[in-house]
Regions:
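Acidic, metal-ligating active-site segments
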Residues: 209, 273-306
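Active-site palm subdomain of RNA-directed nucleic acid polymerases
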Residues: 80-136, 140-145, 211-222, 299-304
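Catalytic palm subdomain of template-directed nucleic-acid polymerases
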Residues: 38-52, 69-76, 105-142, 159-166, ...
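Catalytic palm active-site di-aspartate
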Residues: 31-37, 63-73, 97-126, 149-159, ...
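Catalytic-core region of right-hand nucleic acid polymerases
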Residues: 1-86, 126-127, 137-143, 174
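A short, polar/acidic, helix/strand-boundary loop motif
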Residues: 2, 293-325
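C-terminal reverse transcriptase regions that engage the nucleic-acid substrate
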Residues: 16-19, 148-256
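Two-metal-ion RNase H-like nuclease active-site motif
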Residues: 31-34, 258, 266-283, 327
Length: 330
């Protein structure tokens, strides 16, 4: 890990891969919360001191030396992650290269369990015959609440029923505020944003970014374009950001995962759809490219796993120009 202060957390793409495998094997997804997680992490590899809390009634002039991480300490989450990783590896799990917070357990060539880590929350599923593995993990890390089949996880509602597994992102959308701008100010579209408006604009772009990553790939271009105005946005840009927040509330973003026909992951394929010029940036200083990664079986059933849009420096005016430039770059 390049940054020794940060802790890997499972990505949204890895969660979709997890759900694709789980529903195809007819497993039940579960979550387990760990009690006092940071106190169960590895010992700190440096000296860290804190001022004792008032409730401890420690004599004045004394400080405490921390042996383990605490909530709020920038090293705390990483130390807990390292402890979890080492324990899983000792139990025979493999850490996946595609996501360092995702682990698999294989016995006699067959996948029997998957665990995804997000700070102190484990998302997991597997063959119930090997539930003893989870018992060993809970002995090492005492667990609190354990839920299965219907629960919330990092902003998603995950629900399993006879149709499959639903990944519902509407809980996040419902919590978003939909701000309004006074009509007089809204009419001054070309005016630069003041400090307060700039703060609001950054907040809205951040909310849109989280929504796009989670479910709303249809607004990826809007996100990239609005992100280019973070340092010099206008009232028109703010109004556009507000409009896009409104769009987030218009649709309930639910992705349904159903079983792929081939049970073995060896029979699945990954393919990528990409568009080198999804749209030109409004400032005329670039365009936007996008790619979407899918998993499919040999019958053609497929699920989008992850997507990303990004700014490209070149600007094109037609499809022919785009294809010609792409050919030249190859």
């Amino acid at each position: 890990m390049k940054n020794k202060k940060k802790s890997p957390t499972v990505g949204k793409g890895a969660i979709r891969i997890f759900l694709t495998i789980v529903v195809s094997r007819n497993w039940t997804p579960k979550i387990t919360d760990i009690k006092f997680a940071f106190l169960q992490g590895k010992k700190l590899d440096r000296e860290v001191y804190i001022k004792p809390p008032v409730e401890s009634e420690t004599a004045e002039g004394f400080v405490w030396e921390l042996k383990h991480g605490l909530y709020g300490l920038k090293y705390g989450a990483r130390q807990f992650y390292m402890s979890v990783r080492d324990e899983l590896l000792s139990l025979g799990f493999r850490q996946l290269k595609l996501d360092p917070a995702m682990f698999t357990l294989i016995r006699e060539g067959s996948l029997i369990r998957i665990i995804c880590c997000h700070v102190d929350g484990f998302l997991h599923a597997g063959n119930e015959t090997f539930e003893t593995v989870m018992c060993k993990l809970r002995q090492r890390f005492p667990a609190g609440k354990i839920e299965e089949g219907n629960f919330r996880y990092i902003g998603f509602q995950i629900t399993q029923n006879t149709d499959g597994i639903k990944l519902d992102h509407s809980l996040y959308m419902e919590k978003l505020d939909h701000p309004h701008i006074e009509p007089q100010r809204a009419s001054q579209k070309q005016e630069q944003l003041n400090a307060e408006e700039q703060k609001l604009y950054r907040k809205l772009v951040g909310q849109l970014n989280w929504a796009v990553q989670g479910s709303r790939s249809d607004l990826a271009f809007e996100l990239v374009d609005l992100s280019t105005k973070l340092k010099g946005g206008s009232v028109a840009d703010l109004l556009r950001a507000i409009k896009n927040i409104g769009k987030l509330k218009d649709i309930r973003p639910v992705q349904l995962f159903q079983s792929l026909r081939e049970k073995s992951t060896e029979d699945w394929e990954i393919f990528v759809f990409s568009d080198a010029t999804l749209g030109n940036i409004n400032s005329g200083k670039g365009s936007t490219g996008i790619h979407i990664i899918w998993i499919k079986d040999r019958k053609g059933n497929c699920y989008p796993i992850c997507w990303q849009a990004n700014k490209i420096k070149r600007v094109v005016r037609s499809t022919i120009a785009d294809e010609a430039l792409a050919y030249k770059m190859d």
